[in-house]
């Protein structure tokens, strides 16, 4: 599924997009508040995530953005992207 809005992806769009980009493999019914780290978001996946997010949403993610709080769930990640694109 393509993210339709570069400015504020929904958590559901983000789940599909993360799968499509090969960042992390999530089940089709992965919850919006599901734990991404428990689902397999490891350090290598974070590197892929940063590159994909920066490219797709035309933002820069700094070290301060790469916290457990920001990367915990599709909802928190969508919120981070929304703030960065505002």
Stretches with model-predicted labels:
Residues 2-27, 79-86:
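Thiotemplate assembly-line natural product biosynthesis machinery
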Residues 20-38, 58-65:
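Phosphopantetheine carrier-protein modules
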Residues 45:
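Two-component histidine kinase catalytic core, primarily the HATPase_c
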Residues 65-76:
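AMP-binding/adenylate-forming catalytic domain of the ANL superfamily
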């Amino acid at each position: 599924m393509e993210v339709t809005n570069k400015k504020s992806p929904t958590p559901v769009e983000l789940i599909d997009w993360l799968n499509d980009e090969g960042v992390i493999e999530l089940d089709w019914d992965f919850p919006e508040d599901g734990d991404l780290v428990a689902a397999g978001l490891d350090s290598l996946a974070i590197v892929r995530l940063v590159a994909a997010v920066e490219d797709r949403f035309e933002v820069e993610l700094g070290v301060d953005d790469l916290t457990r709080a920001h990367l915990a769930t599709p909802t928190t990640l969508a919120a981070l992207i929304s703030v960065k694109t505002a």
